[in-house]
């Protein structure tokens, strides 16, 4: 369970998700990352982190293997199942780029399965990919067009068109030269309108030129006229162009039908590269924020060494400042009560811990020393005491109580709970006992809890309990300003 529904927004993970999505190449990767989330399975979390390790290692040693090309062609694959439908040349170019990327990666890691087992397992359809590439490369040339060698008929039509175009051009240029000498033409050259060579004639001389008007300029001062001398040649060219288009479509239709049986392999290859694309984006984001892989164990614990909130650290860096790292541990002690002045950094401590735990269970490195130890939790919950809801007719404190009840109803030994200013928003005579009762309930459920407070009663209560760790935010009593350091 993740609580509340806007948990990611509260701790800042929504911004991290958007930043990672912005680094992706393929649209399918962005869809995957939109649905990407927290896992409470130890083996799955380790798998995700191992995948990042492999990408990081490969990026350091053979970065060219991770240079992705092409675009996501998944939305075009239904065409493969429609009779007489076909992929246009631009789609084939994209498919070739993607499959070449897949092939390059497959060849690069297949011989190093011990080093890159996850990546190698993602690119195993090499035989099918090779077959598709062979078929496509026979038809589509290096310029992304149907090759003149695609069929004997296509080759002959291309040759006939080339020969007739040259002949027609000579005739039209000859007429153009004569008319230019007479001063009938505009300053532009021979051009093409409706697949026919035409001459730009000044409007005042149009009746002096034998031919057919094919177009008029926006100002009406120039008419584009097909000279009568080229009419028969242009007509024949138009027929050849139509025949070439029909033959081109026949070739593309045949190629599409030939590749259609490989649809599942094409989808599998695209899906695999989307996974790799996601790992590349995640790894790049992590490294750009100085994140490292922590030690992972399948138990509900959290031990952070020199941890910072990545978004706060990035923001402060822009201001030429630095975030104050925090070190904290919830292992033998299950509850940490953090006290300190307003604006002293208590909420940042709470959100940093919850965010980093969420990040690692999403498969990301964390902004803390690699010696940090992170466990696996089944529930993550945070209540910041600012849940006023006009729609539900709830005051801030009522919403706070509602949130606490939701957390208590679902808490257990595998829960990590963050409670910011627990019990605040009402008379301290009532707020402090409520806060104490909630913490006692969470203790009895063996949950891990980080609670910030101003109540001295909570500090006194926790002082005599071995499972409760007392912490505070350091304050410079001489300068009268907070130091943003967690002390425990």
Region locations from a protein language model:
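Divalent-cation-assisted or electrostatically stabilized phosphate/pyrophosphate-binding catalytic cores
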Residues: 222-223, 228
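Charged, amphipathic alpha-helical linker segments immediately N-terminal to NTP-binding catalytic cores
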Residues: 272, 278-313
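ATPase nucleotide-binding head domains, primarily ABC-like/P-loop NTPase cores
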Residues: 297-488
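Amphipathic alpha-helical coiled-coil segments
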Residues: 45, 49-52, 59, 73, ...
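Conserved amphipathic alpha-helical "coupling/scaffold" segments
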Residues: 1-153, 157, 262-265, 269-283
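Active-site phosphate-binding and catalytic loops of NTP-dependent enzymes
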Residues: 31, 84-87, 108-115, 174-188, ...
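Gly/Lys-enriched N-terminal cap/neck module of very large, oligomeric protein machines
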Residues: 16, 20, 31-34, 195, ...
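Extended, Lys/Arg-enriched charged tracts that mediate electrostatic binding to polyanionic substrates
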Residues: 156-205, 301
């Amino acid at each position: 369970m993740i609580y509340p529904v806007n948990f990611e927004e509260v701790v800042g993970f929504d911004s991290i998700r958007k930043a990672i999505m912005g680094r992706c190449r393929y649209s399918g990767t962005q869809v995957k990352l939109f649905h990407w989330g927290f896992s409470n399975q130890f083996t799955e979390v380790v798998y995700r982190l191992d995948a990042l390790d492999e990408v990081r290692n490969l990026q350091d040693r053979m970065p060219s293997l991770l240079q992705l090309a092409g675009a996501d062609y998944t939305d075009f694959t239904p065409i493969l199942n429609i009779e007489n439908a076909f992929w246009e040349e631009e789609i084939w170019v994209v498919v070739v780029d993607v499959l070449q990327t897949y092939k390059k990666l497959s060849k690069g890691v297949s011989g190093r399965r011990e080093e890159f087992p996850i990546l190698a397992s993602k690119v195993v359809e090499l035989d099918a990919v090779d077959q598709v590439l062979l078929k496509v490369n026979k038809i589509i040339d290096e310029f992304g067009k149907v090759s003149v060698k695609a069929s004997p008929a296509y080759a002959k039509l291309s040759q006939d068109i080339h020969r007739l175009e040259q002949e027609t051009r000579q005739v039209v240029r000859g007429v153009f030269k004569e008319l230019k000498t007479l001063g009938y033409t505009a300053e532009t050259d021979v051009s093409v309108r409706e697949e026919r060579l035409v001459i730009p004639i000044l409007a005042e001389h149009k009746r002096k030129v034998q031919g057919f008007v094919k177009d008029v300029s926006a100002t009406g001062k120039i008419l584009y006229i097909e000279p009568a001398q080229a009419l028969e040649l242009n007509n024949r060219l138009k027929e050849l162009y139509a025949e070439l288009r029909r033959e081109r479509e026949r070739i593309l239709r045949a190629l599409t039908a030939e590749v259609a049986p490989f649809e599942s392999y094409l989808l599998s290859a695209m899906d695999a590269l989307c996974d790799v694309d996601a790992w590349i984006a995640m790894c790049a984001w992590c490294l750009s924020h100085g994140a490292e892989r922590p030690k992972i164990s399948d138990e509900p614990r959290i031990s952070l060494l020199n941890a910072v909130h990545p978004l706060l650290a990035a923001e402060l860096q822009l201001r030429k400042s630095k975030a104050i790292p925090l070190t904290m541990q919830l292992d033998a002690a299950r509850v940490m009560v953090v006290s300190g002045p307003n604006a002293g950094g208590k909420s940042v401590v709470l959100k940093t811990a919850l965010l980093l735990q969420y990040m690692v269970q999403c498969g990301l490195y964390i902004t803390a020393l690699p010696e940090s130890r992170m466990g696996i939790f089944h529930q993550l919950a945070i209540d910041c005491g600012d849940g006023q809801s006009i729609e539900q007719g709830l005051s801030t404190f009522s919403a706070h109580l509602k949130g606490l009840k939701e957390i208590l109803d679902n808490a257990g030994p595998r829960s990590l709970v963050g409670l910011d200013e627990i019990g605040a928003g009402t008379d301290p005579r009532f707020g402090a006992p409520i806060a104490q009762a909630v913490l006692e309930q969470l203790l009895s459920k063996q949950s891990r809890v980080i609670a910030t407070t101003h109540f001295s009663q909570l500090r006194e209560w926790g002082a005599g309990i071995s499972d409760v760790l007392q912490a505070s935010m350091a304050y410079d009593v001489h300068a009268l300003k907070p130091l943003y350091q967690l002390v425990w």
